[in-house]
């Protein structure tokens, strides 16, 4: 299928892009600038598109992002350190983010005559982000079937929706994803901080997957104490 991948430049979506490139006809990568503090992830998405030899389009929705206040990703709120847990990561929720992006992505896909959109939501996000859950994916597909009825038939692919982050690392390694060129850290510094929830989750995923982590972290050992604290 001619498939457009929504790609942030993170480990999950880059792994997905490489998987789609091997299983389908990858037509383009689509990214969104919503005013996120970790905007450097978009550079990783661009590099991924160049490696895969497909177009990369960035949709500017910063005006929308500016209205979605109250999130550490779009507002002047500190990103918390610690394990990827509900009590620490709830502050990173951007209301309706995936719904907004997917609505635009379906429109772009229809205009470009694509047959599918792929999104890298995964099982580890279910307890924090409601628009990463299977029910949301199924409902959004149904909604788009009605929205594009008679105009386009586009499938929403979410192959990681029941997978763990470690599963994605294994899948990415299988398909040759360049992990070192991906960006996860929500703080958006020069290097991955190693302390925020996404950094801890990333580091733990490589450990559980048994895959070497090529990422340069400012604090490479914090993840161990964060996990010990979670398990205490």
UniProtKB/Swiss-Prot annotation:
GO molecular function: ATP binding; ligase activity, forming carbon-nitrogen bonds; zinc ion binding
One GO BP: queuosine biosynthetic process
Disulfide bonds: none
Highest taxon, organism lineage: Bacteria
Keywords on record: ATP-binding, Ligase, Metal-binding, Nucleotide-binding, Queuosine biosynthesis, Zinc
The keyword Zinc belongs to this UniProt entry's keyword annotation: yes
Main function: Catalyzes the ATP-dependent conversion of 7-carboxy-7-deazaguanine (CDG) to 7-cyano-7-deazaguanine (preQ(0)).
Cofactor(s) the protein needs: Zn(2+)
Annotated residues for binding of Zn(2+): 185, 193, 196, 199
The EC number(s) this enzyme carries: 6.3.4.20
One protein family per Pfam: QueC
Name of the protein in its database record: 7-cyano-7-deazaguanine synthase
Cofactor: record remark: Binds 1 zinc ion per subunit.
Catalytic reaction equation(s): 7-carboxy-7-deazaguanine + NH4(+) + ATP = 7-cyano-7-deazaguanine + ADP + phosphate + H2O + H(+)
Pathway(s) served: Purine metabolism; 7-cyano-7-deazaguanine biosynthesis
Keyword presence, Zinc: yes
Residues binding ATP, per UniProt: 7-17
Similarity field: Belongs to the QueC family.
InterPro entries per UniProt: QueC (IPR018317), Rossmann-like_a/b/a_fold (IPR014729)
């Amino acid at each position: 299928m001619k498939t457009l991948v929504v790609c942030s430049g993170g480990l999950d979506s880059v792994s997905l892009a490489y998987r789609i490139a091997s299983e389908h006809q990858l037509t383009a990568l689509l990214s969104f600038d919503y005013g996120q503090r970790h905007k450097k992830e978009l550079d990783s998405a661009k590099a991924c598109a160049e490696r895969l030899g497909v177009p990369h389009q960035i949709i500017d929705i910063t005006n929308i992002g500016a209205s979605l206040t109250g999130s550490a990703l779009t507002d002047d709120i500190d990103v918390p350190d610690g394990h990827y847990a509900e009590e620490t990561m709830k502050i990173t929720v951007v209301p309706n983010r995936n719904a907004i992006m997917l609505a635009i992505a379906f429109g772009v896909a229809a205009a470009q005559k694509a047959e599918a959109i792929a999104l890298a939501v995964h099982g580890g996000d279910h307890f924090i982000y409601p628009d990463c859950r299977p029910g949301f994916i199924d409902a959004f597909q149904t909604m788009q079937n009605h929205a594009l009825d008679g105009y386009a038939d586009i499938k929403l692919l979410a192959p990681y929706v029941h997978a763990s982050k470690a599963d994605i690392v294994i899948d990415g390694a299988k398909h040759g994803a360049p992990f070192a060129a991906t960006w996860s850290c929500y703080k958006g510094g020069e290097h991955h901080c190693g302390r925020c929830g996404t950094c801890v989750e990333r580091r733990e995923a490589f450990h559980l997957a048994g895959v070497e982590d090529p990422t340069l972290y400012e604090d490479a050992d914090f993840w161990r104490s964060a996990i010990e604290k979670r398990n205490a």
